[in-house]
Amino acid sequence: MNLSQSFLLYISIIVTAFVRGNHQNATLTVKSKVDYSEFKKTVNDNKNLLINHPTKDIRNYLFKLVDGDIFDYWEGTPWDFYGKTLQPKTGSIACGYFVTTTLTDLGFKIDRVGLAECRSGDMIKKLCMGIHSFNSLDKLSSYLAKQPVNSVFIVGLDFHTGYVIKTTTGCYFMHSYYFKKQGVIKEKIDESPALSSNKFFMIGSLTANENLLRKWIANKPVM
């Protein structure tokens, strides 16, 4: 079995697990099988496995990729204000570029540079549904408590942005953190200094945007 066949088998296992509701048992990791270039190519080549599936399956697959695979590859990649690396753990990545680069790597046909360099609120409005604004972390937390698990959001702060991910174990902020150039980290939202020190929050859901998900699977431009 060659590398591409191996990855196709992996994708089939993951998709089947999600359809059957057993995604927590799908423990194979992409990182252990292929390098990042092959990961990007094969994810893009094999999204059509879900093209006739209900939106729930597409949503769960995107959640799995962002929460698991993307973080596994990118964890620890340093932050820099001008960081635009295309390769995890090589060079540096700014917060906006972390979001748009990883979405591009998963096959979303978006304006990677334009969205990374615009205001985070504008990026959220172009990519997300169910957009809300809050003036405290407590209010944001209360909102997230009512949202479904396996959800992926983009959050915009005063001068920062990243993913919020809701899992069965809680809500996490995944972002390229500027403090001491820590770079890509994932932390519980109630333990995040970046969130707790902020005064304004705009959040929108990627996984609730069915039109975006369908265009992603069909390899069509989403904007």
Placement of each model-derived feature along the sequence:
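Bacterial Sec-dependent N-terminal signal peptides
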Residues: 1-24
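N-terminal capping segments
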Residues: 22-116
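Conserved active-site beta-strand-loop modules that form the wall/rim of enzyme catalytic pockets
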Residues: 12, 108, 151-153
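...with weaker cross-activation on analogous glycine-rich loops/strands in unrelated enzymes
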Residues: 117-186
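Polar/charged alpha-helical tracts
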Residues: 37-45, 138-146, 211-218
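Low-complexity, Gly/Ser/Thr/Pro-rich intrinsically disordered linker/tail segments
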Residues: 180, 187-223
